[in-house]
Amino acid sequence: MKGNEAIAHAAIRCGADGYFGYPITPQSEVIETLAELKPWETTGMVVLQAESEVASINMVYGGAAAGKRVLTSSSSPGVALMQEGIAYMAGAEVPGVFVNVQRGGPGLGTIQPSQSDYFQSTRGGGNGDYYVIVLAPNSVQEMADFVDLAFELAFKYRNPAMILSDGVIGQMMEKVVLPPYKPRKTEEEIRQLYPWATIGRTKDRQPNVITSLELKPEVMEQRNLHLQAKYQQIRDNEVRYEATGCEDADYLIVSFGSAARISEKAIELAHKEGLKVGLFRPITLWPFPSQQIAEAARGKKGVLVVEINAGQMVEDVRLAINGEEKVEHFGRLGGIVPEPEEIVNALKDKL
């Protein structure tokens, strides 16, 4: 099945309570598949096409504030419209999941694949000092697997979590093993597991208030310090990556998502030419595996960062390596996906 379809199937199977979204190419199959599967007749999961991306993210905000597993999906310009709601959720410490199947920009751009939302995703695309957890799948299998993982991390840390995919993975068809069914949590389970949730007044506690607003600067500073401490905890415990053939390599390619899949083929071609090249794939783009990249790059003749953009993750790679090794970037723009041969040529030309 397609990567987008895998998102829909996995959402139902992992006990999601609701999906609120709006169709946009190249991710429309997510909501289309959910509409075809009609989970409201089986698990009770709500599926609603909102009137806009702004409406859908605020529906997610409301559902998540009640302790529900809810998600949305969109593509680059649609996700840009959601940034206010995502910032509100981060500030109010509300867990939710959103999927970005990236397309080229800026602006309306193109419907073709891109990875140009890296900055927006890893720096917090709205206002204020906040981060969202960012998972970058490179296969249809990971599209399915990361739905439940994103929910688990979001609720563990009371923080929004993003699956940052792109049009290649979203439209690509592969075999996939779907996760086993999890039942949706009952109201009593939500009350016990998430005491912060707005589940209605009970006799044994004060009413819960979900908000990101605080007018007293001293109190707001303490809230921000609390968030920063939480982000450090996430950095310490949730870094994920995949390193292949890095130890005995002369050169290192760092890439994520579909660009990493293409880089795998490029490395096969490079090996045939006698070049010893390893691949480092960040799976969490935030928290970023800075220390692990620095260790993998140590002693290499050069590092090539391959992205389908003008050069975004390369800045984090350069910060991680801190000038110890040569770091160059190769990417294609406008929705053009690089060929493996182009990556090999860039490796030889730049390094």
Stretches with model-predicted labels:
Residues 1-36:
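N-terminal glycine-rich anion-binding loops that anchor highly charged ligand groups
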Residues 2-7, 228-251, 264, 268:
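Glycine-/acidic-rich phosphate or pyrophosphate-binding loops and their flanking alpha/beta elements
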Residues 29-123, 133-155:
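Thiamine diphosphate
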Residues 132-189, 302, 342-350:
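Structural signature of the thiamine diphosphate
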Residues 158-243:
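Conformationally flexible catalytic loops at phosphate/diphosphate-handling active centers
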Residues 263-296:
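Generic long, charged, amphipathic alpha-helical segments
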Residues 307-351:
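Peripheral docking tails and interdomain loops at the edges
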